[in-house]
């Protein structure tokens, strides 16, 4: 089983947020970053699925060179491979982010074969967007289960567990 999990680098909870001198942006010079909590759950799920069914897991993130910290975190949990998509410092909206991730997935799959499962966190911890995973699934013409709290794989079939209400 080949599992890809996409993670987002977000400001650490409780971090002091400073604004740049011009008042137009967040000053990230002394800001601590972490992996979004929803993606931490997805990383753990990917590792558990590979432990149960064999195969390999890959973590992918886009960001500055410092985002390799989030990739090392995923590797410490047990993810086998890591991919960093370097980006400029410009603002990245969900559409642009999804397009970059889609392109990267297509490139990886053309070289190494398709992923059996692609996991995203339910929403980003910083902006609260629920869009990137949906946009990537649509662009790749893949099925999607939103709000899943876990996955069960039985041969070639999978079931996403979800809590509602």
PLM regions: where:
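N-terminal glycine-rich FAD/FM-binding segment characteristic of electron-transfer flavoproteins
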Residues: 1-165
């Amino acid at each position: 089983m080949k599992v890809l999990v996409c993670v987002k680098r977000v400001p650490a909870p409780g971090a002091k947020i400073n604004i740049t001198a011009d008042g137009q942006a967040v000053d990230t010079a002394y800001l601590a970053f972490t992996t979004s909590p929803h993606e931490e759950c997805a990383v753990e799920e990917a590792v558990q699925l590979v432990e149960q069914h064999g195969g390999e897991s890959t973590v992918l993130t886009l960001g500055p060179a410092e985002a390799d910290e989030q990739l090392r975190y995923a590797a410490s949990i047990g993810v086998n491979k890591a991919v960093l998509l370097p980006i400029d410092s410009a603002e990245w909206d969900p559409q642009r982010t999804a397009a970059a991730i889609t392109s990267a997935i297509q490139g990886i799959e053309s070289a190494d074969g398709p992923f059996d499962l692609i996991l995203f966190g339910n929403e980003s911890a910083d902006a609260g967007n629920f869009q990137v995973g949906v946009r990537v699934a649509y662009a790749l013409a893949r099925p999607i289960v939103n709000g899943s709290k876990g996955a069960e794989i039985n041969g070639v079939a999978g079931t996403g567990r979800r809590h509602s209400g």
